[in-house]
Regions:
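A polyanion-binding, active-site-adjacent surface
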Residues: 2-236
């Protein structure tokens, strides 16, 4: 699926399409069945020029009620761990693969992910972060265009054009699997080390080598999820 074109902004460069315009284009979205059952569409929030963008799976009950991402228990868990990467909530941008809560917190369906994909892709294109932290299976598989699970993907950084991608566990999973939290902390520390060594605007190929950043091909699986993938400019 190609980059979605915002009306009136077909020649915009990365970082020039405003998040507000993308949200307005979403409107009262009914592009899939989730639009019939949600309370609120949950677009995304945070610093529109963040160096680090977090991508989760989808809204939970609290997020659906408030219309904001990561405001429930998983959000509190994430907030408590951000300092490991040298970050605060105010310094990041955060969004989800799907914008509406799947009923009963079930997994999002392929057609639901595909319906939301152009909008997530444009959010990434607007923020144009240096690092994308993928929280859980669905975010990791979408960004890295693979069917491999996060347990196989985590523990490494991947280079995808402009972006460094860090797959890790979803903080909600760590609430129920406490033995996964040290691994999430390890992954966030890896992100923090990369950020400290690579000031914005000074990222080099040598830095990627020094931090053992893997080519995105190392994440490849047997199947690409429907609608998955970063903006086309990422490969340039």
């Amino acid at each position: 699926m190609s980059v979605m074109k915002i009306p009136g902004h077909v020649n915009q460069k990365p970082g020039e399409v405003m998040l507000e315009e993308i949200e307005n284009l979403l409107g009262d979205c009914k592009r899939c069945e989730l639009g019939q059952t949600r309370s609120h569409l949950v677009f995304g929030t945070g610093d529109p020029h963040a160096r680090v963008m977090f991508v989760g799976e989808g809204p939970g009950k609290n997020e659906d009620l408030k219309g904001e991402p990561f405001v429930g228990a998983a959000g509190k868990k994430l907030d408590s761990l951000l300092s490991i990467a040298g970050l605060t909530r105010e310094e990041i941008y955060i969004a989800n693969v799907v914008k509406c809560r799947p009923p009963g917190n079930r997994n999002p369906k392929p057609d639901e992910i595909e319906a939301c994909s152009p909008f997530l892709r444009e959010q990434i294109r607007s923020v144009w972060p240096d690092v994308i932290v993928c929280l859980g299976n669905f975010a990791s598989q979408w960004v890295l265009k693979t069917d491999r699970g996060v347990t196989q993907l985590r523990g490494k950084l991947y280079q995808q054009g402009h972006f460094v991608v860090a797959p890790t566990f979803h903080p909600a999973a760590c609430i129920y699997h406490s033995d996964w939290q040290p691994l999430l902390e390890e992954d966030l520390a890896r992100v923090g080390a990369w950020l400290a060594a690579n000031p914005r605007g000074e990222v080099t190929a040598a830095a990627a080598t020094a931090h053992n950043v893997r080519p995105v091909a190392d994440a490849a699986g047997k199947k690409t999820p429907a609608g998955a993938g970063l903006p086309e400019e990422a490969a340039r």
